[in-house]
Structure formats: structure tokens, C-alpha cells
UniProtKB/Swiss-Prot annotation:
Official protein name in the record: Photosystem I reaction center subunit XI
Residue ranges that the UniProt entry lists as topological domain Lumenal: 94-123
Cellular component, GO annotation: chloroplast thylakoid membrane; photosystem I reaction center
Major location (coarse): plastid
């Protein structure tokens, strides 16, 4: 048992954060396929994809847990609440880009002012699109359920 658990590089004062979970090929593949880490994506497409998921998942909590959840306008209020939060978050992303990146930096990388502006623009468009898509799905859920029963 003493050979199994031993200090990293035989030095008890050096730590290592590698675990069987973090070093597995499954975890590495899963993380490398996320849009934040995927190689070859432009900042605009990266922001668009990340924004779509955020917009899509923001509608549900506002719709089901918002103060108007038991009224007829719950879905509309949930969508407008999600859109309001999306605009606030896009403003925060823009402010972060202004204070974090030098305007002299060039290139299409995400760590430049131009790249961050593209990311923010893509995120805003994607999140509004994701919230709109969630609204369309929830508003037509009864139609979708009757359509699926016809296929059986």
C-alpha cells in the first residue's frame, strides 16, 4: 500500500491536482468539445454558441418561478425577464472587455479588444435567439404533444 500512495515526484512539499477524474480521456474529450475550449472557433461563433445555451436556459426559471407564475402572462413575463437579464449580462461583458483589453491589441483572438467585442456581440445575438426559441417551444408545447401522439 505504501507504493500505491506516494508524494508527487517523491517530494512531499509539492502538490499535484491530477486525479483519476481530471486526467481521464473522457473528461479531457468532454471539456475540449465545450465551446469555451474548442479549438478553431472564432470569437463570434464561440459567443453565439455560448449565448444560445444561456438564453435557452434562462427562460424556464423566470417562467416557472417568477412572481407571475400563476397568471396567464407568466410565459411572456418570463421571456421579458430573461431578455432583461440578457441585456444586463451583455452590458457587463462589454464593460469587462473595455477595462480588460487594450484597444491597441490586434487579431481575432478572444483575448483582444476586437475579439472580445465579437464574442459579446455573438453572445447577445445567440442568447436572444435562445430565449426566443425557448419561448416558441413552450408556447407551442400542446401542439407538439398532439403531433407526437399522431405519430404513434
Amino acid at each position: 500500500m505504501t507504493q500505491f500512495v506516494k508524494p508527487y515526484n517523491d517530494d512531499p512539499f509539492v502538490g499535484n491536482l491530477a486525479t483519476p477524474i481530471t486526467t481521464s480521456s473522457f473528461t479531457r474529450t468532454l471539456l475540449s468539445n465545450l465551446p469555451a475550449y474548442r479549438a478553431g472557433l472564432s470569437p463570434l461563433l464561440r459567443g453565439l454558441e455560448i449565448g444560445m445555451t444561456h438564453g435557452y436556459f434562462l427562460v424556464g426559471p423566470f417562467y416557472k418561478l417568477g412572481p407571475l407564475r400563476n397568471s396567464e402572462v407568466a410565459l411572456l413575463a418570463g421571456v421579458f425577464s430573461a431578455l432583461g437579464l440578457i441585456i444586463i449580462m451583455a452590458a457587463c461583458l462589454a464593460i469587462y472587455g473595455v477595462v480588460s483589453f487594450n484597444t491597441n491589441d490586434g487579431g481575432e483572438q478572444l483575448q483582444s479588444a476586437k475579439g472580445w467585442r465579437q464574442f459579446t456581440s455573438g453572445w447577445l445575438v445567440g442568447s436572444i435567439g435562445g430565449a426566443s426559441f425557448a419561448y416558441i417551444l413552450i408556447a407551442n408545447v400542446s401542439f407538439l404533444q398532439t403531433g407526437s401522439s399522431l405519430l404513434k
